[in-house]
């Protein structure tokens, strides 16, 4: 039989192969759609908590999947289920396991039940935390819900390819790149393009010229809000026309395509991939005329805000409906006059549709049974224990009632089982028999298992953890070599760049002038403008660059010029970087080091120390607060030996202070989570960190003149804090505690106080009320006097310590006022 060929995906294939591909695509689209439809019903009937699905976006995702190659990365959002199915990284059963929040990583490989369904990820790590070969698999960075939150990371994922292609020192890292030929694929909804993160990323990608293909799924709405309220001209491609490259300017290649046009979508995505992959030019694909057959999510119906005409238009332009029409209408005449068709008639498609529905129905049932069977086995175990208890307990009537309540729950949760078990234990507080011990053991085992399933992997738990890196002290020459402290930073970074060829450092003014405090002086000239580079004023995407680069095997150090500017990036640090390892159950990591400088210097905008907000928003990131540049340099060396993300806050007023230059630069290490007693004393423990610690040291000298012997502890690390509980050992000796910092009241000092008094049980050793000394609640005022009256001074520290000693021994320490 003569077979004709058809040009598809830039290669010649036979018609039968083309036919098979088209019909398989249609089946994937239908499976995805059925998952959305049935998923909504599962939520509305109470089996799942919430659903947000990709219906109405299926066909363009099929096209994207065909252009997506192994080694590529996706950074998208919660509409991309069809794409994940098309590349073979999501099955229908896994889709429902995620919907039910099944905590088995084998059942829900996206997050082990930690994220709501629709948040997709692939596994970048082996069980021991080491990297897989990312060039041999399809890669999806883990999704987050905040709209446009995927954008900054996308920039870094794309930039990694550019670095791997152009920087010879990293081209040996073949697990992460094949000569920089990988494309980073982004997806976003049309309404979310209104977010600042979108525009910041689009601009940065155009400047950097990175291989990024950005798809905008446009259904004209953002929940209930129409595009006319979202986007100027109601079209993101229209307002981004200025980014279109031309003969004189680098920029973007921009495509506009209807989301229901299967043939044109296939063509456009192949072209886009070729441009990005070969030329390293960013591409924007504006996919229009998409729909939302079920509205935004399970929380409401789009019939509340769309009129009948719009609903009918969406029904007519549903991308699967249009694909179905195209399949039925398709005819190709051969040279001999034969007519080739995909199907003989509608019956062929009905068979596919029934198969798709069957696949999804079975997948849903299997996923639900797998989820429920685990819980039912726990329920059975508790029921048997409670039956035995009811026979012996004086409160047997109450125990039986709880047992019967549990048995009568047709679809129990783990919460149901454990809640009743714990309540029954309350009735047994004065009774003792073997069944009570069984119940206690069950509760303990369940809580331990719950900790593993719900509360692990906040930071690295492997041998690669930064907490496993031991201290290595700096060594010094026999003759002291006192230098400006910034020289220690510069020379240590020089040693780092020489030792670690995968380290790249970037930020505002970090490149040509070597940062505003000269800690990178001359290093761009020595190592090139790829490894040491300037960026625009765009803090969120500086962090995004770092996240993406770190996820692709590089060791980025991203500089935020001042701690005050960190607020621009705090959202992406909190929502994306801090949660990455947790939300993937330890299957992805981004060991990004964020360098900044802060604490006291000058005025409202350059003297901030908002540590309370930072530590409470960044659980999952180490927060390190070295008191000098030697300690800071040691932290960088430690972090590069581990695989955790971290924020290092250098002392802004410390670069010109004199420190002794170590001889083992790049090698000495400051331990993370370990405090340092910088002065021993017997009367009171004072804990501080950063720039303020120097004031505490000065105040301690004055206090010694009046007979008060202060023990000074440098916290060094706020997250984690004092893992060896050395602070409480000091409090047990002095019986008094003062925490001093320059955050606002109730900030990091309150956190430290809780750590020592509550977590370390330091309360039991106190003879005096524990105290904090902080800055005022307002931002620090400008000028020398503004600083003096805004932040703790030497005199403030002296008098606070003296007041505590006066309260303890008023006869010896007379009142000052």
Please name every model-derived segment.
Residues 1-49, 70, 78, 458-470, ...:
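Cofactor-/ligand-binding subdomain signature composed of acidic, glycine-rich
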Residues 58, 62, 139-420, 652-817, ...:
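Thiamine diphosphate
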Residues 132-141, 149, 437-474, 619-623, ...:
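Helix-enriched interaction subdomains in cytosolic or periplasmic regions
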Residues 397-545, 550-552, 564:
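Non-catalytic terminal/interface segments that mediate subunit docking, oligomerization
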Residues 588, 598-602, 606, 611, ...:
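Active-site phosphate/pyrophosphate-binding segments
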